């Protein structure tokens, strides 16, 4: 049986994942409207991935006979200065989500909730992967440059990542 604290934290995480999906959808839209189709595709796909993270949490809660408590999702940021800023914000956002997951893991350990601890190991690994991915993209954008030809090359680099993650 899940403790009240774990239930509260997992419900909050569902909403954080839904917010993440909306944020990446907003970033994707900005990219597409600025002819950055590669980054737009990557972020669009990533929005769907975040939605799947929320679904996985919902299923876990439901399997434990816990009703999910969805809250309102605030409007995501939609004005950005450029591709570097988008990926910097995305990287920082992933770090925030990692902290949140780690906090739930800490609570599961303290309450000796082995099932939740085991379930969350997938999220721990996933967050590590996402932080590495976004940091790598950010580093490449900064290396290539965010101006003219560099911006095009950076967009094509991100497009390549999006396509490789689908296969």
Curated annotation (Swiss-Prot):
Binding site for Fe cation 2: 50, 94, 127
Annotated Ferritin-like diiron domain residues: 1-145
Biological process terms in GO annotation: intracellular iron ion homeostasis; iron ion transport
Keyword Acetylation: no
Highest taxon of source: Bacteria
Entry-linked CDD domains: Nonheme_Ferritin
UniProt-listed Enzyme Commission number(s): 1.16.3.2
Key words of the record: Cytoplasm, Iron, Iron storage, Metal-binding, Oxidoreductase
Phosphoprotein among keywords: no
UniProt cross-references to InterPro entries, sorted A to Z: Ferritin, Ferritin-like, Ferritin-like_diiron, Ferritin-like_SF, Ferritin_DPS_dom, Ferritin_prok
GO cellular component terms listed in the entry, alphabetical order: cytosol
Subcellular location(s) of the protein: Cytoplasm
Ligand binding (Fe cation 1): 17, 50, 53
UniProt record similarity statement: Belongs to the ferritin family. Prokaryotic subfamily.
Name this polypeptide is given: Bacterial non-heme ferritin
Organism encoding this protein: Helicobacter pylori (strain J99 / ATCC 700824)
């Amino acid at each position: 049986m899940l403790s009240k604290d774990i239930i509260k934290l997992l419900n909050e995480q569902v909403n954080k994942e839904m917010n993440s999906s909306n944020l990446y959808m907003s970033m994707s839209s900005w990219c597409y409207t600025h002819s950055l189709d590669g980054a737009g595709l990557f972020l669009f796909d990533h929005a769907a991935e975040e939605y799947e993270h929320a679904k996985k949490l919902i299923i876990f809660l439901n399997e434990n006979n816990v009703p999910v408590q969805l809250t309102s999702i605030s409007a995501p940021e939609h004005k950005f200065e450029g591709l570097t800023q988008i990926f910097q914000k995305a990287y920082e956002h992933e770090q925030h989500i990692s902290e949140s997951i780690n906090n739930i893991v800490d609570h599961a350990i303290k309450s000796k909730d082995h099932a939740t601890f085991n379930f969350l190991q997938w999220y721990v690994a996933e967050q590590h992967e996402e932080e590495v991915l976004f940091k790598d993209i950010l580093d490449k954008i900064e290396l290539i440059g965010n101006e003219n030809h560099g911006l095009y090359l950076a967009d094509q680099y991100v497009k390549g990542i999006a396509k490789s993650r689908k296969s």
